[in-house]
């Protein structure tokens, strides 16, 4: 890119992460940016050079090259925008912006002109692929306006920024889905304090991220059942960990299932409008889709359903919430 700009008679210089430097911690493969020293690049810019910075990489405080992991390039762009107090950070992708849902599944999905940081963060964390959660969280922390644009089409894209007025116009902003889900159920766990801490603490030691959790009374008196979801890619590790601690926990039965999908609706209007959960659950019921697990946040409702129904669920919910208008 730097060479191409030079051929257009534009002065440009390329920078590796260590040359900037972009300082990170030592977690190789998923390093976290700690600081960006701006003096070198700023001096180059003042001399008329366009700065081309490699994403996805940094250097630790003991001078080891690190990589930032998934979403590292977008995160680098946002971090640079924050460090230089830029008015906006533009992210060019293979799509024209952020859509109400996956347009490959719902043909009438609409491109959003605007979405808040919180909504985008929820959509990204629940399976939307446009941006990774790290870049959105960083933009939200430093109040960097983000714009998602297409590399192939000259269209306005989607602006991601702080909440604006008239946020009650739509009940929800978007629908996300995650196919990388596994459901685990532990049955007949002795009902006593500390059991959940023991189970999830053991999983955390092996970096297994637990998402949706449901605990209910067992048919056997004095026992409880616990169901939770994890990334399907972590299922084998989770099975080994749980079998290892079975003696300490005392559960009677372990079951796992992978043919499940998480569907999430997201919108700031949930803070002030009632009936959104009702609409979601009634829509799924009318289409004979059984809900296995439910989890909520202030602006999100997620349900776990059988994978054979996820496309039907997304299309039905998109229609029910008038997102195609």
Give short role names for the model-derived ranges.
Residues 53-54, 86, 113, 122-180:
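Phosphate/diphosphate-binding glycine-rich loops and adjacent basic-rich segments that engage nucleotide
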């Amino acid at each position: 890119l730097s060479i191409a700009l030079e051929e257009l008679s534009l002065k440009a210089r390329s920078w590796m992460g260590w040359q900037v430097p972009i300082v990170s911690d030592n977690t190789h493969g998923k390093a976290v940016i700690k600081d960006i020293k701006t003096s070198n690049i700023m001096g180059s810019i003042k001399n008329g050079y366009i700065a081309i910075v490699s994403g996805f990489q940094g250097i630790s405080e003991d001078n080891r090259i690190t990589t930032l992991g998934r979403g590292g390039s977008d995160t680098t762009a946002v971090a640079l925008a924050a460090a230089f107090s830029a008015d906006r950070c533009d992210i060019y992708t293979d799509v024209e912006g952020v859509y109400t849902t996956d347009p490959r599944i719902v043909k009438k999905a609409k491109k959003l002109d605007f979405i808040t940081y919180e909504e985008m963060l929820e959509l990204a964390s629940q399976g939307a692929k446009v941006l990774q959660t790290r870049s959105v969280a960083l933009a939200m922390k430093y109040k960097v306006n983000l714009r998602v644009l297409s590399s192939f089409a000259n269209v306005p894209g989607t602006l991601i920024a702080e909440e604006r007025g008239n946020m009650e116009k739509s009940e929800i902003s978007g629908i996300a889905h995650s196919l990388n889900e596994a459901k685990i159920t532990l049955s007949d766990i002795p009902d006593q304090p500390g059991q959940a801490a023991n189970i999830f603490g053991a999983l955390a030691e092996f970096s297994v991220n637990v998402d949706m959790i449901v605990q209910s009374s067992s048919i056997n008196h004095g026992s409880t059942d616990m169901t939770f979801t994890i990334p399907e890619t972590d299922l084998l590790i989770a099975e080994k960990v749980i079998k290892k601690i079975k003696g300490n926990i005392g559960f009677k039965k372990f079951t796992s299932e992978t043919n499940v999908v998480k569907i999430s609706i997201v919108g700031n209007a949930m803070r002030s409008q009632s009936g959104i959960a009702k609409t979601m659950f009634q829509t799924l019921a009318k289409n004979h889709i059984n809900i296995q697990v439910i989890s909520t946040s202030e602006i999100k409702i997620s349900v776990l359903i059988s994978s054979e129904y996820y496309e039907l669920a997304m299309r039905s919910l998109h229609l029910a919430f008038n997102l195609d208008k």
